[in-house]
Amino acid sequence: MIGDFEIKDEDLAGRIGILETKHGKLETPAFFPVINPVKNEITIQDILSVGFESIITNAFLIKKYIGKEEDLHSILNYNKILMTDSGAYQILQYGDIDVSNVDIVNYETKLKPDIAVILDIPTGLTEDKKEAEKSVESTISRAKEASKFVELSKDEIIWVHPIQGGMYLDLIEYSARIADMNQDYKMLALGSPTVLMQRYEYAPLIDMIYKSKSNVSRGKPFHLFGGGHPHIFAFAVALGVDTFDSASYILYARDHRYMTRERVYRLEELDYFPCSCPICSRYSPKDVMEMPEEQKVRLIALHNLYVIKEEINYIKQSLKEGRLFEYIQQKAYSHPSTFEAFRRILNYSKYLEKYDPRVKGEVKGVFLFDNSSLHRPEVIRHAYTLSKIKQRSKALVLYCSDSKDNPLKNTEDMKNADVYIVLPFYGCVPYNVFFTYPYFQSEMPSTIDKDVIYDLKNKLKEFLSQRSYETVSIIGCEKILHVDSIRGAPVNLLLNKL
């Protein structure tokens, strides 16, 4: 059925899903390149050649400059997935447009896109909360106003309910809850983040995405308007964003800005292209610089599209392998703004753990690096698991080991005692589960970060204080904890050493 969304794979709060549309199945995460119906610097055929199977265009501009009231697929000579925006971006840019919500929604029903957006009122980055509240209420009102058109076209079009609120997280929460309750709309979208992304202000964007996603149904696909920089895709996907749209690829190209997955260069800065796409394999930066302006813009735009496509594919592969946390950890160090985004997303580690699958198909290694790895779902989940394990003996044996071989050779230590392995990042791991996932599959540096050691000592203190052991033995922990081995000692002796 049109609008059905099936989740195929999950990692953190991200997912690979299949959205059913009239013109085929859309696999998410997915990017919708913005097509300008008036300018043809990049053709739809160019976009298809890069590998995209979904585009977005502006119904307001179609109405204003083309005016045809017929199937937009025919107008554009395009038979794949098509989304229409309504003119809200023009409101954000120019303050108002000469068309009503009812007019544009009615026009969209005649264009018959696969996915369509009502004419909402963007909040933008206004500092006037009254204005922000007005934009939220107006958007909610317009969604209700459009319901009769939505109902009549629901078998052909997936309608999107925008979420507004700008920088006011309480308004975003309210807007998200109301949007989610309106069952006429099968897709949701966060509006107004474009300016933040243009400024590389990713940390507040993380807050906005979290606040909206944590207050809507998991089963509805979620769109991020204006999400066009490879910098931010992985962080947004980790929080549960499914689709993006942007004209960034062409806007950057007009300014001779060359995207990579880590940063943006100006063409004149480059002696070599750090890319092997068909454009960069054929030309050098000098070649492109010497081309006529129109050709130069076209080639940079095509390259930018290849980079966006590559990033989306890399995110999907990381998600499929259960390595999305490691990937955003890696992305964090590509730019100070992504580092801020990563630090901000760690504030929501419990939310990420909530949706992260406990077990995936093929077991992969768990790579642990520094104190940021303490926020991984596997590590957070261990604390809950440990709290459920009951004390069975009066004696406790703690063992530190750098080896994945059997860490306890001396079975005498194990008699009549509860036995735990002291494992950096996790804390105390029951011996009988040490050889299971994720503990045995965890890979970590031979020299452990001092913040991780500090955390490990605190976890050990907490573990000891929550139980009533009479004696404790600690073995082989000189290197990790800087504590000499002791056997059968009072618990307070170890606590004093920690």
From Swiss-Prot:
It catalyses: guanosine(15) in tRNA + 7-cyano-7-deazaguanine = 7-cyano-7-carbaguanosine(15) in tRNA + guanine. Signal peptide: none annotated. The active site is at D85 (nucleophile). One of its GO terms (cellular component) is cytoplasm. It is an enzyme of class 2 (transferase). Gene3D superfamilies: Queuine tRNA-ribosyltransferase-like. It comes from the Archaea. Its EC number is 2.4.2.48. Its cofactor is Zn(2+). Pfam families: TGT (PF01702). Binds 1 zinc ion per subunit. The keyword Transmembrane does not apply. Zn(2+) binds at C275, C277, C280. GO terms for biological process: tRNA wobble guanine modification. GO terms for molecular function: pentosyltransferase activity; zinc ion binding. Substrate binds at D120. Keywords: Glycosyltransferase, Metal-binding, Transferase, tRNA processing, Zinc. Pathway: tRNA modification; archaeosine-tRNA biosynthesis. Exchanges the guanine residue with 7-cyano-7-deazaguanine (preQ0) at position 15 in the dihydrouridine loop (D-loop) of archaeal tRNAs. Belongs to the archaeosine tRNA-ribosyltransferase family. This is tRNA-guanine(15) transglycosylase. The lineage of its organism: Archaea, Thermoproteota, Thermoprotei, Sulfolobales, Sulfolobaceae.
